[in-house]
Curated annotation (Swiss-Prot):
GO biological process: respiratory system development; response to lipopolysaccharide
Family, per entry: Belongs to the GSTCD family.
Lineage: Eukaryota, Metazoa, Chordata, Craniata, Vertebrata
Species, as recorded: Homo sapiens
Chain positions covered by the region annotation Disordered: 191-233
Tissues expressing the protein: Widely expressed in cell types relevant to airway function, including airway smooth muscle cells and epithelial cells.
Top-level division of the source organism's lineage: Eukaryota
Protein name: Glutathione S-transferase C-terminal domain-containing protein
Record-annotated GST C-terminal domain positions: 130-332
Signal peptide: none
Amino acid sequence: MKAIKKSLTEEEYLYLDFSHQTEGCIFPLHTSVTLFLLSYCDCKIFKICLVVTKEVSRDSSLLRDDLIQDVEIQIISRQELPPIVQNCCLPAVVERSDNFCRAGLAVVLRHIIQKSYEADPLKKELLELLGFKKTCLKACAEVSQWTRLCELTIPLAIENFLRESSDQPPTIPVEILQLEKKLSEPVRVHNDDKLRRQKLKQQKADGVGPPLTKGKAKSKVHTQETSEGLDSSSKSLELKVAFSKLTVQEEPATTNREPSHIRKAKASDLPPLEHVFAEGLYFTLADIVLLPCIHHFLVIISRKFSEKLVEFPLLASWYQRIQEVPGVKTAASKCGIQFLHLPKLLTTSTEQHPNLCEVPGVEEQSDPLFIGGPRPTMAKLMEKGIEVMFSPHPCPTWTLDWNVLPAAVSPKEGKMSSDRALRKQQQLNNLVYVVTNQAKPGDRIVDFCSGGGHVGIVLAHMLPSCQVTLIENKELSLIRAKKRSDELGLSNIWFIQANMEYFTGMFNIGVALHACGVATDMVIEHCIKTRASFVTCPCCYGFIQNTSKFNFPKSEQFKKTLSYKEHMILCRFADQTAVQLPPQRRLIGKQCMCLVDLDRARAAEECGYSVQVISMEPESCSPKNNMIVGVPI
C-alpha cells in the first residue's frame, strides 16, 4: 500500500469492488459498468485498484481476460484502502490529497467522464453522455427514478437473477419489465415541440405512413459502424436526431418556416417521439450503465429461455440499436462482452403487464381528495392531544465571536451578501452551541448535505480533537468548501462527494443545516442506524412526500390520527413562512412546521431517542428556523 500512497500525489486512484466472476460477468455489476465506461472513454488517467475479499486470489493474471485490455490493475484488500475510502461504498475515487473522496456509482461515472474530457477536450461526445444541462444521473436515487433504476434496482435485480438462474423457467425481474414499460412511454426533451412538428411534417408528406426517407443519404456522414446493421427505423426523425448528436453534428438550421398547417397544429395533435435510447432520443450515461447489466441478463435468457424474449421486445431493440453507437462495440470487446444477435420481436409487453405503472415501495394513496386549509387538520391533532409545542432553547443568547475567528471560517467567505452572511452566522450559532456541548474528544461528526461547508468548517475549527466529515452530492460546493479548509490548514476534515447512503462509516454526531425535504428524514434515519446523536434544521417542507424509503406520517401517534394527504396539507402550509407574507399566515406556517417536525421527533423517540424540537434564535435568522435535536437514550 506504500506504493499507492506515493502515487496519490501524481494521479487519482479508482477503487472497485470484486467479489467473484461468473461466465465472464464481474460481480458486483457496478464494477462491470465502471470498467465498461473506462473502456468506452479510452480513459487511462486513473490507477485502478480491485478490492477483493480474503477468499479471492490476488493474482491479477487470473482476472486479466475479463477486465479491460491494456489497463494495469492492482489487487488490494479492503484493509489496504485509504481510511476515507473505508468509510464509503465502492466504487470510489480519491484525490491526491487523500482527504477528498468521490463515492457511489453515479458520482464516480460522472467524474470519469469529466476527467476524460479534460484530458482530451476534442472528445466532445463524452460530455454529451451527461445529457441536457449535464444532469444525467446527477440527482440522488431518492428523488430521481432514472438514478434509482440505473444505480440501484436494475444492477441488484440482475445480480439476483444471475445468482438464482437455473434450468427452470425464471421469473423475469419486475425491474426489467418496468424498464420495458419506460421504453414504451412518449419521449420528453427540451425541444420536443419542434421535433414533433418535424415528425408531423414527415408523416404528412408520406401520407401518414412511414417517415420520410430523405435521411438515408444523410446517414452516410456517420461512421461506418453506425451505418451498418440498422433496420428501416434508421430513416426515422428520432434516429437522425439521435445519431447527429452522437457525432456532435447538429442538424443544419433551416431558414424556411414550416407550412402553416404544421405551425398551427395543436400540441395534442402532434405525434409522440419514440425512444431511441434509454432516456429518450440521446445516448447518455444511463445507456452506458444499463448495457453491461442487460447484456448479461440477455445472455442467460437467450441461451436457456429464449421464449421469454417476447416479454421485452423494446428492450431487445434497444440492445440491438446500442451496438451501432460509435465506439460501443470496441469498448465491449475490450471488456470481454460478445454481443448477441437477437431475433426481431414485433409484440409489445405493455398489455402483458398492465400493472407496471405502480412504483415499488411507494404505495398508492386511496384517501379521498382533501379539501381545505390546515386548520381542520390541526384541530384533528388537538383532539388527540397533539399540539404545537417547542422545547426551550438551551442558550438563546450564545454566539461565536466571529470577529476573532479566521476569515475563512466565516460564511462571508462563501460569496454571499452581508445580510445573508449575518443570518447564516446566526444559524450556525445555534448548531455549533448544541454540537460543541455534545461532542467529546475523538468524536466523529458528519455534516450531511454540507453544501459549501459552512457548518462543517466551523465545527472542524472549533473542535480540533474531533474528526469532521462533509458529505455533499454537488461537486462545486464541496470544492469550494475544500478550498476554504485548505486556507485554514485544517487536518481533521474529510470531504466526500456522494449521496449520504454511500457513507457507511461510524460516527457520533450527525448535523444537517437546511437539508431539503426528505433529505432531513434520510439524515435522521442514518443517525438512528448508527445510534448517533443528530442536530438537524429542516427545509423545503413542501417537497416532503412518500418515497421508496419513507411513508408519511412517520410516527405511530400521527399515523393513527392523520392520513397521508392530511400530512401533506401540513407540509404545504409549513413552507409559507417567508417574511413578505402576512403575519397570521406566517404564524400558521410556523405551527405547521412544528407539527411536521413533531411527527419526525415522535418517530425517533419510538427508536429509543430523546428528541426536542427547538426554535432557533433569533427567529429572523431564517424562515425555516426549527431545529430537531436527538440523543440516543
